[in-house]
UniProtKB/Swiss-Prot annotation:
UniProt-listed GO biological process terms: DNA recombination; DNA repair; SOS response
Protein name: Protein RecA
Keyword field contains Manganese: no
Xref: PROSITE patterns: RECA_1, RECA_2, RECA_3
SUPFAM superfamilies in the record: P-loop containing nucleoside triphosphate hydrolases, RecA protein, C-terminal domain
Subcellular location: Cytoplasm
Length: 343
């Protein structure tokens, strides 16, 4: 009984000192809400993440080799957040964002905030200010490797700057993490891969910017290009594999494959065909695909073409796939589900 009184007294003192809600029992009727998620634009990846997308109010890291689809995936997330009326910002440290490509993926350029900072400190200060404002829902930093410390920029070429970027990232993570949670703003860091020297056994790959981001990120996605999609002799896209390397909100280590078509982004209809067959929603007999009593095409490309031409059927298939995985039917506020992009 004395312990219960002592605990009650301690809780009351903490609430007086730090405000109501600063400490509470997790299962009690409290303002702790279910984790909100924003769709990635890929139905398969939404399912693999376990909550229907990337969690809001968290730090996310997306890394992979060059031209693997890192920026494409993040632009799809931006487009999905904008569909829900969210405010998005893109911190383009690489100075390489293609506005026309972003527009093709569904990004509203008129509503997108963009910054092209000169130094790493400036970039992270901009991120911190936007997060603390509480008015921004999603911030993308492209990329961690391009967040060059001011001391390195002002120094001579060839000067040794041991660990300066890692120190910068470590300080930024400590400063950002609390305000990101309070403002419910998602911050996505795109990262590049480097090779460790002298690794005989194990994976020699590592990401730039030290270890701080690995610890603070709630979700880490490893994205890789696995093959080419050809139309006769022309390469028209890539098959892409994403592995959920770390996930604090659902079981990790799930993998998903989807197509990224050049100039169009993630092929949603291709995913509906593949995931529909896996979920038993779409039947495959030989090379023929059918939905219900209706044949939708001979061969995968013809089935994709049918779904592009029949968005109602595609919407029904998507709803049934989501339902089979226990996900919400729609990710938009209008309750009509995601818009199908012709891909």
């Amino acid at each position: 009984m004395d312990k219960a009184k002592a605990l009650e007294s301690a809780l009351a003192q903490i609430e007086r000192q730090f405000g109501k809600g600063s400490i509470m029992k997790l299962g009690a009727n409290s303002p702790v809400m279910e984790i909100e998620a924003t769709s990635t634009g890929s139905l398969g990846l939404d399912i693999a993440l376990g909550i229907g997308g990337l969690p809001k109010g968290r730090i996310i890291e997306i890394y992979g080799p060059e031209s693997s689809g890192k920026t494409t995936l993040t632009l799809h997330v931006v487009a999905e957040e904008q569909k829900k009326g969210g405010v998005c910002a893109f911190v383009d440290a690489e100075h390489a964002l293609d506005p026309q490509y972003a527009k093709k993926l569904g990004v509203n350029l008129d509503e997108l905030l963009i910054s092209q900072p000169d130094t790493g400190e400036q970039a992270l200060e901009i991120v911190d200010t936007l997060v603390r404002s509480g008015a921004v829902n999603l911030i993308v930093v492209d990329s961690v490797a391009a967040l060059t410390p001011k001391s390195e920029i002002e120094g001579d070429m060839g000067d040794m700057q041991m660990g300066s970027q890692a120190r910068l990232m470590s300080q930024a993570m400590r400063k950002l993490t609390a305000s990101i949670g309070r403002s419910n703003c998602m911050v996505i860091f795109i990262n590049q891969i480097r090779m460790k020297i002298g690794v005989m056994f194990g994976n020699p790959e590592t990401t730039t910017g030290g270890n701080a981001l690995k610890f603070y990120a709630s979700v880490r996605l490893d994205i890789r290009r696995t093959g080419a999609i050809k139309d006769r002799d022309n390469v028209i896209g890539n098959t892409t594999k994403v592995k959920v390397v770390k996930n604090k909100v659902a079981p990790p280590f799930r993998e998903v494959e989807f197509d990224i078509m050049y100039g169009e982004g993630i092929s949603k209809t291709g995913e509906l065909v593949d995931l529909g067959v896996k979920a038993g929603v779409v039947e495959k007999s030989g090379s023929w695909y059918s939905y219900g009593d209706e044949r939708i095409g001979q061969g995968r490309e013809n089935a994709k073409a049918f779904l592009r031409a029949n968005p109602t059927v595609a919407g029904d298939i998507e709803d049934r796939i989501r339902a089979s995985h226990g996900l919400d039917f729609s990710t938009g506020e209008d309750g009509k589900g995601d818009d199908l992009v012709d891909m």
